[in-house]
Structures are given as C-alpha cells and as structure tokens.
C-alpha cells in the first residue's frame, strides 16, 4: 500500500521540479528583472524628459511663447556653427555665470564649456559603449574615456552619478535610438582665451 502512494508522490514531485525549472520567469538568476528593449527605451525616454537633458543638450528656437526645443537638432549639443558673442567675463567678479541664449554654452570660472552632442550620430554618442556612458556619468569623464578630461560645468554628473544602473541603461538605450544629428561640438575654452 505504501508503494502505491510513493510512486504517484514521486511522479508529482518530479513533474513539479521539471515545471518549475522550465517556467519562464521575469527575473534572472541574479535576481534582476528582465525588461524588453522596447520597455527599456520607453523608460529611458521618460527619464531623459524628467531630468532635463534637453535643457542644455538641445538648441532652442525662440517663439512668441518663449523658447522651444529645436526638434530638428534635438540632443545635438551646442551647434558648431552657432554665432557666439564675446563673453563679458567681468560679471563673474560678482559671482555670476553666463549662459548662451539657447542654454547650450556656459561661461564661468572654468572658462567656456559647450554642451555635448548626445544624439545617436557618430559625432555624438553613436559609437559609445554602455561602459563609456556609465564612466561619463559616474566618473565625470569626457566622452566616457578613462583618460578623458573632466566634464565641465554646468553638467551635473555629480548628481546623476547616483542614478541606478537600470536607469542609466535605460537612458543610454533611449539616446541610442534618438535621431542622429551630425554636429561636432567645439572644445572648451579657458578663461584666458576669453579675455
């Protein structure tokens, strides 16, 4: 009689193990949730919009309602052919910094910096690896290169470095799907070059 109960119990137990091991779970063995590429990109789009990447990395068009993002050049950074007036560095004595009228360039005690092209073009982050993106944000390295110069103000990388790995992955995934905008942003200028 005991054998009659043991055989079905063994079969049910074995089948349970097979079903559990073959089941499609939404988490990896490390416990991370698996997310589709589409969901990752959507999350990245949301994050890019709420943290204000467009504020500095997208040129603006002035309208009768104020300025709007120039969608033709979205994420292109400071346009290489944008005319720039001479910066009045004397106002920095009073503790001020200066911004270009489209917010893609700033002048301060560090000199003049230009917002980077973060579009998917090769002149932007098109050829970057995820590792480079993480290094740029986490370590404040230009172009995410180990030997790169430090990112300059006003880029708040020291705040963004606290974002989670999944959030940075999502932002990178979204930016890699953005419209490629060819634009070689000028290099920074020292304060001495501005005088």
Q: What are these model-predicted stretches?
A:
Residues 44, 50-60, 133, 171, ...:
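The canonical Cys-X-X-Cys-His
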Residues 184-187:
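Extended, well-folded interaction surfaces typified by the phenylalanyl-tRNA synthetase beta subunit core
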Residues 73-134, 158-168:
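Electron-transfer interface patches adjacent to heme c in soluble/periplasmic c-type cytochromes
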Residues 23-25:
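Bacterial signal peptide processing site
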Residues 18-21:
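C-terminal motif of bacterial Sec signal peptides marking the signal peptidase cleavage site
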Residues 1-11:
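Bacterial N-terminal signal peptides that target proteins for export
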Residues 56-62, 138, 156, 176-177:
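Detector for the c-type heme attachment site
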């Amino acid at each position: 009689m005991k054998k009659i109960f043991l055989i079905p119990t063994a079969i049910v137990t074995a089948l349970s193990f097979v079903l559990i091991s073959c089941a499609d779970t939404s988490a990896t063995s490390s416990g991370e949730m698996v997310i589709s590429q589409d969901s990752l990109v959507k999350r990245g789009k949301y994050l890019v919009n709420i943290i204000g990447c467009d504020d500095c990395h997208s040129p603006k068009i002035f309208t009768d309602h104020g300025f709007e993002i120039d969608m033709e050049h979205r994420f292109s950074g400071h346009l290489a052919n944008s005319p720039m007036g001479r910066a009045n560095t004397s106002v920095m004595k009073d503790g001020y910094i200066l911004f270009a009228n489209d917010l893609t360039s700033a002048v301060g005690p560090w000199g003049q910096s230009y917002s980077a092209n973060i579009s998917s073009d090769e002149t932007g982050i098109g050829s970057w690896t995820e590792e480079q993106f993480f290094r740029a944000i986490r370590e404040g390295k230009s172009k995410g290169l180990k030997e790169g110069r430090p990112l300059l103000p006003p880029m708040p990388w020291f705040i963004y470095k606290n974002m989670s790995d999944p959030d940075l992955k999502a932002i990178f995934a979204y930016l890699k799907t953005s419209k490629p905008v060819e634009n070689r942003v000028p290099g920074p200028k020292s304060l001495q070059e501005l005088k």
